[in-house]
């Protein structure tokens, strides 16, 4: 498993370099659906990760936000679950709140996670039973016991839509942040106490970060 962590870390850094080369520069934006943008930075990083990870692990399955899904992955015991750019809206807005997210599931359970913020050079990694790390240093969640002392980190769009207005008084602070993966990584490293989402998520949003927690 250590070899797979090293592979995923190397892939995440290289994909992050692709994203960094486009950040606050020129790129194309298309829309997969309502309020669901995708850039050529997303697709280029996705193509790189698919080639890098599957060439090293040809017997593994593949599930990515930016790749066409295939039922063949359901026949595989191990599946890479990837979001090449988690936080596309933040990327487009010029905010450094986005991640390369690489998870590995074994028999349907997350066992490895690597997340990389290429602007802040934050590399989060974990594999099952071995703890979580940020740039090589062990990290852990806070020991906050009560909601009144908790720093809640939430989606910026949910704050803008005032979805949290009825619940603000329960928490010490509400901090906006893009990227589900980044929010969970910040909780795992003790920089926030709780993340709650009021909207549904996909496997590629949470698989890698699940391992950090």
Q: PLM features: what roles do these ranges have?
A:
Residues 73-135:
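DPxDG-like acidic metal-binding loop motif
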Residues 142-212:
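An extended, acidic
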Residues 43, 47, 66, 84-87, ...:
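Generic detector of well-ordered alpha-helical packing
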Residues 64-66, 136, 178:
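Short loop/edge segments at beta-strand edges and connector loops
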Residues 1-85:
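N-terminal subdomain of lithium-sensitive/metallo-dependent phosphomonoesterases centered on the IMPase/IPPase/PAP
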Residues 15, 19, 42, 53, ...:
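Residue-level signal for inorganic ion chemistry
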């Amino acid at each position: 498993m250590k070899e797979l962590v090293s592979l995923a870390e190397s892939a995440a850094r290289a994909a992050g370099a692709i994203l960094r080369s486009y950040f606050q520069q020129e790129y194309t934006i298309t829309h997969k659906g309502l309020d669901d943008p995708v850039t050529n930075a997303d697709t280029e990083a996705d193509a790189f990760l698919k080639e890098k990870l599957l060439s090293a692990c040809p017997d593994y399955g593949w599930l990515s936000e930016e790749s066409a899904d295939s039922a063949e992955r359901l026949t595989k015991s191990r599946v890479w679950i990837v979001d090449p750019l988690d936080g596309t809206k933040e990327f487009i807005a010029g905010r450094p709140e986005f991640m390369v997210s690489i998870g590995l599931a074994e028999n349907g359970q997350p066992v490895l996670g690597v997340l990389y913020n290429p602007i802040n050079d934050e590399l989060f990694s974990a594999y099952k039973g071995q703890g979580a790390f940020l740039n090589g240093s062990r990290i852990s969640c806070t020991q906050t016991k009560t909601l009144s002392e908790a720093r809640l980190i939430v989606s910026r769009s949910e704050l803008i839509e005032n979805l949290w207005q009825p619940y603000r008084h329960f928490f010490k602070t509400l901090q906006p942040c893009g990227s589900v993966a980044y929010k969970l990584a910040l909780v795992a490293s003790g920089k926030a106490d709780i993340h709650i989402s009021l909207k549904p998520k996909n496997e590629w949003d949470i698989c890698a970060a699940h391992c950090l927690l």
